[in-house]
Amino acid sequence: DHLPPASPDSPNRPTGLVPLGVFVAVDTDESVTVTVPRPDMGQGPRTSLAMTVAEELEVDWTAVRVRQAPAGSEYGDQTSGGSTSTRVHHRGMLLAGATAREMLVRAAAAAWGVPRESCRATAGTVEHSPTGRRLTYGSLAESAAAMGVPPASEVTLKSPAEYTIVGRPTSRIDNPDVVTGRAVYGSDVRVPG
């Protein structure tokens, strides 16, 4: 049979996280959870797509957690094959990270009553450049989510020349779960009946 779509009260939905769009959520402990839409069949999209989001979000890679998307149309095509996951989702995940960053910057600017242009995201915080004041992503997440997702036309992607995470060597983010047996695979899922 098949797995039903995730509902708001589903155990597959993370708790304690503030969603900033479909693929990014921020917690008050300053961690960021990236929901990856494609299963990992060995090529590492859980790591590469999370790196892509972290790059645009301006968050430390060590603060990133990954969650596999549950069944649901909001996550788009969830198939895997032909080593296409990273190629197909790269730009969309860049946009997801950049959109979350823009939401957090706007929330900080509103909190300080300053122009958005005077604020910038850096290392999991938003800084007001003229004064050096900072607010953490965790402290801004609720107000950022309440402001809503800006249109893509109002979101700017970084230049690849500015990348500090993408293109750098790293271990796969899910290696600890794989080697300790905590990773959940399709064969681990039990459907009632």
Predicted segments, located by residue:
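Cofactor-binding beta-sheet edge motifs in enzyme active sites
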Residues: 1-193
